[in-house]
Amino acid sequence: MIQKDPLKKKTFAVDIDGTITLNGMGTIHLGALSKLRSLKDDGHNVILVTGRSSAEGYLLSIFGGLTHLAVGENGGCITFGDKIQHKLLGNKGECVHALATIQSKLDVEIKEKPVFPRMTEVVLERTFDIEQAQKIIDGDNLNV
């Protein structure tokens, strides 16, 4: 049933991993997805939010029958619309610069994690001391 009173329409922003998944492998809990679809069918917006790429969240929103909008890359990108559009809020160039700066100052190998391609960030494997990297970022006043 579609919500008749537009003042009662709500927007639900729902995390994917660890919230509507069954395990660390990304298996979607179908019961949770069904409840979210019921909210959408009742006239509410159901938006998926994830640290993954927004394209992954967007595809799940389509196949799951939810609102065709997803926030991804830790808030860096919004993917939406029936004609797929991306709103970039982050700047991948700044991330690449920060990575190069950290790599030049730490004496360890820093590897990018093989994940779905990102538009606004880089994803790193946990092969280095994050606190040392944070000190470099802060000391060089990097905008990441």
Located regions from the model:
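Non-catalytic pre-domain segments flanking phosphatase-related domains
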Residues: 1-14
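Active-site phosphate-binding/coordination module
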Residues: 27-116
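Hydrophobic "anchor" residues
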Residues: 19-20
